[in-house]
């Protein structure tokens, strides 16, 4: 469901990734290379996390529904030593099943909430708390999706003050996914976000 607008986002991203080169430096102490890192007090095997996906059957395949996909995703990421973000959407079961999978993994996953109205966000935050998630995210770039723009009560983009109010509802780190500009990154920081995903 990505590549909105001109439809070339995935292609342009692929082209840009082809420009990235690893610069090898052999003037270092000879030892085992490690990609391990720590985030929010947890250890991970690599700085690579699986992104949030919802409405799996509608967008991708009949092989999985949201519930079975989230279970497989969370389990596989945990076995690989990384974490997964889980998705959200119009169907409440998307968020519920993601949080259930995170709970089954002892909170090792990051439920991702769409930028709904505050009352819906509060309900979804309660699900993340029941799941004992170690962090919670919001995919703020979803604000442009037609179903959010036309939602009643209003949903979508958030001001710094609105984002801060959401941060204050949480007792775990809050990640803002879908930051597109340096200015937006500074706004997320001002609101109290613990991290961003560009």
Task: Give short role names for the model-derived ranges.
Residues 39-88:
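Active-site cofactor/substrate anionic-group-binding motifs, chiefly glycine-
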Residues 64, 74-75, 103-105, 115-198:
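Alpha/beta enzyme core
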Residues 68-117:
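A gly/proline- and charged-residue-enriched helix-loop-helix capping module
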Residues 1-44:
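An N-cap/entry alpha-helix motif that binds or orients negatively charged groups
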Residues 29, 86-87, 111, 137, ...:
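General beta-strand structural signal in soluble alpha/beta enzymes
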Residues 55-56, 88-92, 141, 182:
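Short glycine-enriched loops at secondary-structure junctions
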Residues 32-37, 96, 120-126:
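Short alpha-helical segments and helix-capping/turn motifs at coil-helix boundaries
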């Amino acid at each position: 469901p990505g590549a909105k607008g001109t439809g070339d986002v995935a292609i342009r991203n692929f082209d840009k990734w082809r420009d990235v080169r690893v610069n090898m430096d052999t003037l270092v102490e000879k030892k085992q290379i490690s990609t391990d890192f720590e985030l929010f007090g947890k250890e991970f095997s690599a700085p690579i996390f699986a992104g949030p996906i919802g409405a799996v059957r509608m967008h991708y395949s009949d092989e999985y529904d949201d519930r079975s996909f989230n279970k497989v995703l969370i389990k596989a990421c945990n076995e690989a030593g990384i974490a997964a973000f889980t998705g959200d959407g119009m169907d409440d079961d998307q968020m519920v099943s993601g949080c259930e999978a995170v709970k089954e993994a002892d909170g090792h996953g990051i439920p991702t909430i769409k930028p709904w109205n505050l009352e819906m966000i509060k309900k979804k935050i309660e699900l993340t708390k029941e799941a004992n998630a170690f962090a919670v995210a919001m995919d703020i770039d979803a604000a442009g999706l037609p179903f959010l723009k036309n939602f009643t009560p209003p949903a979508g983009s958030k001001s710094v003050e609105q984002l801060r109010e959401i941060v204050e509802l949480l007792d775990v780190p809050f990640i803002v996914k879908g930051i597109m500009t340096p200015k937006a990154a500074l706004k997320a920081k001002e609101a109290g976000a613990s991290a961003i995903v560009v």
